[in-house]
């Protein structure tokens, strides 16, 4: 366990519980000293003022220190590092190069977060015990409830920016060839609310046209901006016809230029 100063007690307990359930050794440690040493070198040796840094600088330092330690552990034991990013995180670049993006194989890189929720439940049922802590899995009824919300825990009160379930489905459909303009037209006509997206659109407040457009633009532009991370993901164990590594990608900032008129119409409706 490579604990940061921001790790919750629940996270530490979950790590111990999982190790116990699988019968594997857990080594507990903290990366705080290395993080502070990195800050000191940048400030005292190179003259940077950490009060002027965006928070992402220290978040990435923590992730890269973890990557460094994992690589060192692997070298000591004659092993390798396995990547733990899921498909949505890879798509949106929600990882740090040379940090949590390292590894020789990405076994779950073709699984969305929702796939992993379902797989975790199947594992618990198969083993007839709590292997994957239940507090990590959401309860979905007329709402979604998290006992332990997904978080990188690299700063205080940090939560994942993704709208889980909705963004998982949107990514799957876009990668499977869904026409984004047809998707927007279905939203305009309200047809989208009658299908698989309806529940999640309402749950996340995306029945508000302005919020919908804001989220769609964020998602699609983030997807395009992070092509360079998608290309540098370790080899992915393919479970679908469209895993990253087999998809031609384009680095850019544009939000599907062919959809700009539709997005404007939805916003002004």
Task: Give a label for each model feature.
Residues 1-269:
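ATP/NTP-dependent adenylation/nucleotidyl-transfer catalytic domains that generate, transfer
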